Amino acid sequence: MAAPVVGDADLQSVRRIRLDVLGMSCAACASRVETKLNKIPGVRASVNFATRVATIDAVGMAADELCGVVEKAGYHAAPHTETTVLDKRTKDPDGAHARRLLRRLLVAAVLFVPLADLSTLFAIVPSARVPGWGYILTALAAPVVTWAAWPFHSVALRNARHRTTSMETLISVGIVAATAWSLSSVFGDQPPREGSGIWRAILNSDSIYLEVAAGVTVFVLAGRYFEARAKSKAGSALRALAELGAKNVAVLLPDGAELVIPASELKKRQRFVTRPGETIAADGVVVDGSAAIDMSAMTGEAKPVRAYPAASVVGGTVVMDGRLVIEATAVGADTQFAAMVRLVEQAQTQKARAQRLADHIAGVFVPVVFVIAGLAGAAWLVSGAGADRAFSVTLGVLVIACPCALGLATPTAMMVASGRGAQLGIFIKGYRALETIRSIDTVVFDKTGTLTVGQLAVSTVTMAGSGTSERDREEVLGLAAAVESASEHAMAAAIVAASPDPGPVNGFVAVAGCGVSGEVGGHHVEVGKPSWITRTTPCHDAALVSARLDGESRGETVVFVSVDGVVRAALTIADTLKDSAAAAVAALRSRGLRTILLTGDNRAAADAVAAQVGIDSAVADMLPEGKVDVIQRLREEGHTVAMVGDGINDGPALVGADLGLAIGRGTDVALGAADIILVRDDLNTVPQALDLARATMRTIRMNMIWAFGYNVAAIPIAAAGLLNPLIAGAAMAFSSFFVVSNSLRLRNFGAQ
């Protein structure tokens, strides 16, 4: 068992403590726990009803003390541990809760059908009452209103002990009141009254409310069952992500033997073996072997990536072929995989401003409903209605009110969206991104590592004079690569990579800031700046001169290759644009967004890249702090700015923007600075991430409109006597079901 996220040391510093809170049944419960915690000096708490997690920033308090405060409020709490994140592949509390509810629901539904039929018959047609009819109805109703409804009664009793109320209080009081009134009517001395029409069984004939008590139980259980099942589905994406982690790992011993141990016991710098079909157990560096690695489950990237010795690999990915010996560089909770799982869970436990308002309303909702129900019943009595009619109205108000929908409106949408985003390689860190996204009008891109692959490559080879054959081209590239193979310059690596098999070099000489030279296969070869290569013999070849001018106008680097004193070729070296760059920029512009490029390159290079990918404007010669200044100036002009970068030298810009998107594998700076992490190194995920955020906000707004609108409309209708309690109970259950089901539509986001 892992230790709690926050220890007990250094109590005087502000520490973030996370607690699992059990026993909350509605948003009012979450609001009550949050209020209790926030009353403590030095404590700032946020309680999420959907995830049952309390996030607390506390000074001078240990986790045990905070758990005690929650216990006094009538709920159970325990420190949230890292294992509750990483072991989600085996833990599905909502699924288990749904199964428990289903058992009660099935029994209640089976008994409710004959109970409803007989209650209606006996109420409408008293002459149909057989001897012992009251005992028959009581026998059918008793298991439903006691055992099946016990989850509501138990919470209501616990609330009563702590002098609080919740949604369960409304339900339990409604069930108990309907049952007591019915038993009094059935076994009392009231003479039977004939009625006509099914509604008279509820409104004006004998007051047999047993089917109402049982019906409310059935409908609410059904609503809670579907709600729990839907929340289980909402968390399935996170469990699927956690499932990617390896369960066991084969550790390589010093004598070459292998020892299989649980992956949780793997230590940093230990070497382990991964074979085809196996999951890499930790982040690490390949020591031996070569293999294609399937990154799709982690990043959504369909194309396998080939790993060689010295290559970095990510835990949670799968080896497709070959055998790899890997040295672990990060294990357990320190891996990139674990960090991404934490990002998803943390996003699910945060609250939006709208949700805080909803929770505040839910906190006072239940007492207000009791007052409204009492006033409605009293008003009907004062107006001359009978006690039966007044009771029916009071009961209808009690059972139709539903703060649950308010509490579920935002977190269920966020749970589904963050889970779906994880499947697509998009990690939304919190509600800041969602609340900002709708006003974004400008997207700023870093160049190196964001629009480009971040690696220099030979983009063009221009031959001099008549040497235009493929054989001549390969020969010159081979000679240049042979000389450059002895150099450590970044451009040298690009030239070497362009030739499949460079030969050996002798007499290598490097001239700082100019170029290199050496003897290759009996030829004297020089590679370097055009001005250095032509220092003794000017080059007048039209093709080479044109290639030089064109390359330099685009901001690319041009080098000449001289063989035995004759300039043979011009090589253009540039950072290659990503294949997805132009399509991603076009997608953003089609959404009405302005695009800007920020780069440290010169003006020519910046304009060339902007033109190639279709960016509206470019700002050149930027230092990292200069990027922050540009973003700040845009914001002062009234623009809402999103910054897309790789987190390597643009961390401050990611923080300074209204919305930061870090693309690529994600450095520690990026994980801390960005609002959205795009794990897949594909720029098409930028518009996709913005679309997902917008879709999530639309869903949240729809949920909130429904939740508020339902209660605003339903309670007055019930108080006016226009709904019988049975239909009121069904409507209350449906309100929560609608919110959760609407959120589940986000599971299909991005599906083709």
UniProtKB/Swiss-Prot annotation:
It catalyses: ATP + H2O = ADP + phosphate + H(+). The active site is at D446. Residues 15-78 form the HMA domain. Its main location: membrane. One of its GO terms (molecular function) is copper ion binding. One of its GO terms (cellular component) is plasma membrane. Keywords: ATP-binding, Cell membrane, Magnesium, Membrane, Metal-binding, Nucleotide-binding, Translocase, Transmembrane, Transmembrane helix. It holds the Pfam family Hydrolase. It is found in: Cell membrane. GO terms for biological process: copper ion homeostasis. Its EC number is 7.2.2.-. The keyword Kinase does not apply. It is a multi-pass membrane protein. Gene3D superfamilies: 3.30.70.100, Calcium-transporting ATPase, cytoplasmic domain N, Calcium-transporting ATPase, cytoplasmic transduction domain A, HAD superfamily/HAD-like. NCBIfam families: ATPase-IB1_Cu, ATPase-IB_hvy, ATPase_P-type. Belongs to the cation transport ATPase (P-type) (TC 3.A.3) family. Type IB subfamily. This is Cation-transporting P-type ATPase B. It comes from Mycobacterium tuberculosis (strain ATCC 25618 / H37Rv).
